[in-house]
Curated annotation (Swiss-Prot):
This is Large ribosomal subunit protein uL6. Disulfide bonds: none annotated. The gene is rpl6. Part of the 50S ribosomal subunit. Interacts weakly with protein L13. This protein binds to the 23S rRNA, and is important in its secondary structure. It is located near the subunit interface in the base of the L7/L12 stalk, and near the tRNA binding site of the peptidyltransferase center. It comes from Haloarcula marismortui (strain ATCC 43049 / DSM 3752 / JCM 8966 / VKM B-1809) (Halobacterium marismortui). GO terms for molecular function: rRNA binding; structural constituent of ribosome. Keywords: Ribonucleoprotein, Ribosomal protein, RNA-binding, rRNA-binding. Belongs to the universal ribosomal protein uL6 family.
């Protein structure tokens, strides 16, 4: 009967609604559905308990995965997750703007139509000249937003050694922090 108990940090509140675990802190809130057969996840006072009646390799690995997800949620609502990105161009000066819940890149390789991508979840995108900072409490939403921005400037059918324009991830969060 494997059982893992995770201590809830002081400034964090955790609630359970059926299969969903919601963690709230100073930096926001994150909700995640944690379900797997024969694994129970519950909030018991100031701890989150992950337990199972089964004792096989798949169940043990899933318990470890759930433990990592919950630790990432705790880290996200207390300190947050942050990606650093940099705008690089050599041919045409591109402009990167945030309009509502979208990131808009104009004049990429001289294109007339702007390229757009959505900002996921509670993620904030800040632009300071050629530097972008993507931050928020949910590691998956922050990472997906950064990846979408990077993929938005992907160049096809041209020599990537010559056309190096784009927005690139230059700094990732240290996942060992959680």
């Amino acid at each position: 009967m494997p059982r893992v108990e995770l201590e809830i940090p002081e400034d964090v509140d955790a609630e359970q609604d059926h299969l969903d675990i919601t963690v709230e802190g100073d930096n926001g809130s994150v909700t995640r559905r944690l379900w797997y057969p024969d694994i129970d996840v519950s909030v018991d006072g100031d701890t989150v308990v992950i337990e199972s009646d089964e004792d096989n390799a798949k169940t043990m690995s899933t318990i470890g995965t759930f433990q990592s997800h919950i630790e990432n949620m705790f880290h996200g609502v207390t300190e947050g997750w942050e990606y650093g990105m940099e705008v690089f161009y050599s041919h045409f000066p591109m402009q990167v703007n945030v309009e509502g819940d979208e990131v808009v890149i104009e004049n990429f390789l001289g294109e007339k139509a702007p390229r757009r991508t959505t900002i996921h979840g509670d993620t904030d995108v800040e632009i300071d000249g050629e530097e972008l900072t993507v931050s928020g409490p949910d590691i998956e939403a922050v990472g997906q937003t950064a990846a979408d921005i990077e993929q938005l400037t992907r160049i096809n059918d041209k020599d990537v050694r010559v056309f190096q324009d784009g927005v690139y991830i230059t700094r990732k969060p240290n996942r060992g922090d959680a």
